C-alpha cells in the first residue's frame, strides 16, 4: 500500500478525533478522542518515516506511545475523581473541582 494512503487515513482519524473533542461533553469520550488523535499522529509519523526511508518517525511514535500511556494513567485518575465527587463524567463539571 502506498504510504500516502496511510497519511489520508491519519488525517481522517485526526479529524474524527478532533470532531469528538469539540462536540462531546462526556470526559471519557473526550479522552478517547484525544487518544485517537494521538494515534493518528503516530500513524502519520510512521508513514512519513516509511516514505523517507529512515527510522526517526518510528522512534518518535514509540516515545509518543510511552507518553500517552502516562497520560492515560493521570487522565483516568482525574476522571474517576471527578465522577466520585460529582456523580457525573461531564466536562462541564470539571470546572467545579477544587484545587
From Swiss-Prot:
<keyword id="KW-1003">Cell membrane</keyword>
<comment type="similarity">
    <text>Belongs to the complex I subunit 4L family.</text>
</comment>
<keyword id="KW-0812">Transmembrane</keyword>
<keyword id="KW-0520">NAD</keyword>
<comment type="function">
    <text>NDH-1 shuttles electrons from NADH, via FMN and iron-sulfur (Fe-S) centers, to quinones in the respiratory chain. The immediate electron acceptor for the enzyme in this species is believed to be a menaquinone. Couples the redox reaction to proton translocation (for every two electrons transferred, four hydrogen ions are translocated across the cytoplasmic membrane), and thus conserves the redox energy in a proton gradient.</text>
</comment>
<keyword id="KW-0874">Quinone</keyword>
<comment type="subunit">
    <text>NDH-1 is composed of 14 different subunits. Subunits NuoA, H, J, K, L, M, N constitute the membrane sector of the complex.</text>
</comment>
<protein>
    <recommendedName>
        <fullName>NADH-quinone oxidoreductase subunit K 1</fullName>
        <ecNumber>7.1.1.-</ecNumber>
    </recommendedName>
</protein>
<dbReference type="GO" id="GO:0005886">
    <property type="term" value="C:plasma membrane"/>
</dbReference>
<keyword id="KW-0813">Transport</keyword>
<dbReference type="GO" id="GO:0048038">
    <property type="term" value="F:quinone binding"/>
</dbReference>
<dbReference type="GO" id="GO:0042773">
    <property type="term" value="P:ATP synthesis coupled electron transport"/>
</dbReference>
<dbReference type="InterPro" id="IPR039428">
    <property type="entry name" value="NUOK/Mnh_C1-like"/>
</dbReference>
<dbReference type="InterPro" id="IPR001133">
    <property type="entry name" value="NADH_UbQ_OxRdtase_chain4L/K"/>
</dbReference>
<keyword id="KW-0472">Membrane</keyword>
<feature type="transmembrane region" description="Helical">
    <location>
        <begin position="59"/>
        <end position="79"/>
    </location>
</feature>
<feature type="transmembrane region" description="Helical">
    <location>
        <begin position="3"/>
        <end position="23"/>
    </location>
</feature>
<keyword id="KW-1133">Transmembrane helix</keyword>
<dbReference type="Pfam" id="PF00420">
    <property type="entry name" value="Oxidored_q2"/>
</dbReference>
<dbReference type="GO" id="GO:0030964">
    <property type="term" value="C:NADH dehydrogenase complex"/>
</dbReference>
<dbReference type="GO" id="GO:0050136">
    <property type="term" value="F:NADH:ubiquinone reductase (non-electrogenic) activity"/>
</dbReference>
<keyword id="KW-1278">Translocase</keyword>
<feature type="transmembrane region" description="Helical">
    <location>
        <begin position="28"/>
        <end position="48"/>
    </location>
</feature>
